[in-house]
Structures are given as C-alpha cells and as structure tokens.
C-alpha cells in the first residue's frame, strides 16, 4: 500500500468499491497483492500504476500492518482469506510520481487532504495504517481479523 503525496498537502485516495471477492472497501490508499516472482517494492509500483495510472518511484518503507485469522475467516472477509492464516501489508510513502490519475475497477481516485479522508468513509483500520505511515515512532499495527488493530 502506498501513500502518494502531491507536495500541496494532499494524498491520492482510492474509493475502493465493495466486491464479492473482497469486502474491504471505503477510502484507502492504492495497493494490492505480491505476485509470484515479484518483490514487494515491484508489486507496489505495479499495483499503483494498475489502480491509479501513476508510476511511483523513490518509495520509503514506513512499516507494516499485520493481522491474523484464527479458525475460519469472518463471514465478511475477503474471499482469498484462508483459515488460520497471517496477512502482512507493507506500507510505503512517496512524493515521486509521473503520469495522470485515472480510476480503475478497484475504485475511483482523487487527491484530498488527510483531514478530508479522515472525515469520509475510510476502509476498516485505515487510521492505524495512516499512523504507521506518518508516525516515526510507530512501525507496526497488529490485530486479529475483525478487530481494531493495535499500534506497536
């Protein structure tokens, strides 16, 4: 996941659409899954371009968000969630990008301030994602699926 900053106090926000395969929706930053044979950084660059039209560079790794599913996933979990599993999201920031923004099947995108994002319908636990990205003293958020994440 990547927070892209425009240098004018705004970040690129995606209005993630609810899908049958993934119930995680709302305002979030672009990002996705790592494909086989792909590094984490390469996956962020690819996912951001696929979802927003922007090509990012000079990525700064801020920390991680991890959560565990104990037993069966909650009914509203993403279809790819497996029983007794752990998921890790790598959180990046950048101010370096090229291209023009465009929406994708994942959702529409627009520039907004963090205050505007926070006052909107954010995806679950996005506040904890933002804290890890912005607070140099916090580098991880952890929790069990369906619960609020703890900052570490």
Where does each model-flagged region fall?
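A conserved beta-turn-beta hairpin within the catalytic core of GNAT-like acetyltransferases
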Residues: 20-25
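A residue-level structural signature of the nucleotidyltransferase/glycosyltransferase Rossmann-like core
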Residues: 10-11, 26, 109
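Conserved N-terminal beta-strand and adjoining loop/helix that marks the start
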Residues: 1-11, 30-33
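Charged phosphate-binding loop/patch that engages nucleotide di/tri-phosphates or the phosphate backbone
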Residues: 131-152
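Unchanged
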Residues: 33-57, 68-129
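Conserved S-adenosyl-L-methionine
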Residues: 60-63
């Amino acid at each position: 996941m990547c927070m892209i900053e425009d240098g004018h106090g705004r970040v690129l926000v995606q209005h993630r659409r609810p899908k049958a395969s993934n119930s995680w929706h709302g305002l979030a930053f672009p990002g996705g899954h790592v494909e086989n044979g792909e590094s984490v950084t390469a996956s962020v660059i690819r996912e951001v371009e696929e979802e927003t039209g922007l090509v990012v560079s000079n990525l700064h790794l801020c920390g991680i968000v991890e959560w565990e599913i104990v037993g069966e996933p909650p009914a509203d979990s993403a279809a790819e969630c497996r029983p007794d599993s752990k998921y890790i999201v790598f959180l990046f920031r950048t101010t370096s990008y090229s291209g023009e923004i465009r929406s994708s099947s994942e959702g529409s995108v627009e520039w907004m301030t963090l205050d505007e994002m926070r006052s909107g319908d954010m995806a679950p636990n996005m506040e904890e994602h933002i804290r890890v990205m912005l607070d140099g003293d916090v580098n991880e958020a952890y929790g069990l699926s369906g619960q609020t994440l703890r900052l570490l």
